[in-house]
């Protein structure tokens, strides 16, 4: 199964990468094993979001920038509002990256 490496830029992905780098630097972990952990992280995040997340959210905001390159859409919104059934959250600036899920099956 192919995966995207997008989730490595999330907070949890960056913390994992930083921890793995520290472990490789100290000799606790081999670089090859660290790469395997990151590949498994990519697969697990894709699977979890695909199978376990059931809630829906609507997003409104001012479109600052958009880009389409290599079947990947990137949107940067300012003054964004995220709304689900229970709550609304205001965010000053948000970057949304959307990939075609059909690319995963290639």
Swiss-Prot record:
MF-aspect GO terms: RNA polymerase II general transcription initiation factor activity; TBP-class protein binding; translation initiation factor activity
GO cellular component, one term: transcription factor TFIIA complex
Xref: Gene3D superfamilies: Transcription factor IIA (TFIIA), beta-barrel domain (2.30.18.10), Transcription factor IIA gamma subunit, alpha-helical domain (1.10.287.190)
Locations listed in the record: Nucleus
Note: The displayed sequence corresponds to the form of the protein present in strains susceptible to X.oryzae.
The protein's assembly and partners: TFIIA is a heterodimer of the large unprocessed subunit 1 and a small subunit gamma. It was originally believed to be a heterotrimer of an alpha, a beta and a gamma subunit.
Family: Belongs to the TFIIA subunit 2 family.
Protein's name according to its UniProt entry: Transcription initiation factor IIA subunit 2
Protein species of origin: Oryza sativa subsp. japonica
